[in-house]
Amino acid sequence: MSTTNKKQYLIGVSGGPDSIYLLDRYQDQIKVACHINYNKRPTALRDQLIVSDYCLKNKIPLEILSVSPSYQYHKNFQDQARKIRYDFFLSTGLKYQVDQCLIAHHKDDFLETAIMQYDKNQELLFYGLHQESSYQSLKIFRPLLNLWKDEILSYLEQDKIVYGVDESNFLSTYQRNKIRTNLSKLSQEQKQARLDFFLELNKKNQVRYQSVKDFFSSWDCNYLDLINSLEYYNLLYLWFSKNNIKYSKQKAENILSFLQKKNNKRFRLKAGVYLIKEGIKLKIVKL
């Protein structure tokens, strides 16, 4: 991740403390800010105005996507909202000719994600959030993963920077919110101990994880190489995560059965997305 003063980044800004902090710290390097108003809660317009006021004051170009209140979400809201969000980042990046995006995930987000993954009994080689990832052609950077939420709030309060609070973050509807509530009851030392547990797991699996990433750098989509690998499940997890497809061990086992049968040519991964066999080659296709 470059840290020059060149205006090279797109940034996602919700109006909450994390993204406002990130915007304030990187404002000189921001080419365009993106805000999505899902119109799902009474304070949505307030957050939009917080973002637009900050960008106007600091002369930062801003693109706003306002989702119709009547928009029908046909599946998990958070999953669909994420797709809407990142598709908007992608199209805005193309418009402004920028392919690097800043996201305000911090140390608490890392820990919450790691706990969610661990609680699902997913035997992963990496828990938490990556400093760098990608969404299609867009490079994603998370420069706040070394900061706790409390540190972000202290900065904003000290500098009297306005931000909004998303009240849906406190609803027990979502598993992440339940984990967040439980973590809020811990001391800083206890939270750090939980974090250290996952960092140690990641360190222990570092060599194996690198070998899984290296596999894809030379893989020619021959599915025999995939199913014959001792890291089959981890390979599939990484491949799916890069293509925004949910992974489960049961799905991986069903795919293994599909690949071992000669007659079947396609496997449904999610609505409109299939795994297609063409000879010994394998690809993910939207139909």
UniProtKB/Swiss-Prot annotation:
One GO biological-process annotation of the entry reads:
tRNA modification
Q: What is the catalytic activity of this protein? A: cytidine(34) in tRNA(Ile2) + L-lysine + ATP = lysidine(34) in tRNA(Ile2) + AMP + diphosphate + H(+)
Is ATP-binding a UniProt keyword of this protein? yes
* Annotated Pfam families: ATP_bind_3
Q: Which residues bind ATP?
A: S14, G15, G16, P17, D18, S19
Q: Which GO terms describe its molecular function?
A: ATP binding; tRNA(Ile)-lysidine synthase activity
- Gene3D superfamilies from the entry? HUPs (3.40.50.620)
Do the record's keywords include Plastid?
A: no
Which function does this protein serve?
A: Ligates lysine onto the cytidine present at position 34 of the AUA codon-specific tRNA(Ile) that contains the anticodon CAU, in an ATP-dependent manner. Cytidine is converted to lysidine, thus changing the amino acid specificity of the tRNA from methionine to isoleucine.
Which NCBIfam families does the entry mention? lysidine_TilS_N
Q: Which PANTHER family match?
A: TRNA(ILE)-LYSIDINE SYNTHASE-RELATED
- Family assignment from sequence similarity: Belongs to the tRNA(Ile)-lysidine synthase family.
Protein name per Swiss-Prot or TrEMBL: tRNA(Ile)-lysidine synthase
